[in-house]
Amino acid sequence: MPFFVRKINIPTIFGIYFGMKTDKKTDKKNLNVHFIGVGGVSMSSLARYLLSVGFNVSGSEIAPGENLEKLAEEGVTIYIGQSAENVEGKDVVVYSDAIKEENPELKRAVENKSYVLKRAELLKIVSENFSKKI
């Protein structure tokens, strides 16, 4: 696990949101989740899922694409280009193995003490909320 990833206790994604001690934990609409590199199949699916259950979702990608247009139409805030400003005010930042440590969004999320999760960690959390797993 990279040095910059905060290890947190997460019983469920919907019970105590990401283990956060905040007044936001009772209202998903006030919890801001950002995906660095949201254009891929897995990251966009996780973004759609969190949006569908009521979270505030945003994501960034280095270049525009059809999948990003669809995400935007569904209600995900999309940023083209990856900039530190994109993660300001975000409570949780999700990234995949394709994202390098020097990524400006990832670096700022760590500086801001946002909860930083790998895509695989979020996928595990989400899957724990279903009785049948594939």
Locate each region found by the language model.
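Walker A (P-loop) phosphate-binding motif
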Residues: 35, 124-134
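N-terminal, intrinsically disordered, basic low-complexity segments enriched in Arg/Pro/Ser/Thr
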Residues: 1-3, 17
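Polybasic, lysine-rich low-complexity intrinsically disordered segments
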Residues: 3-8, 25
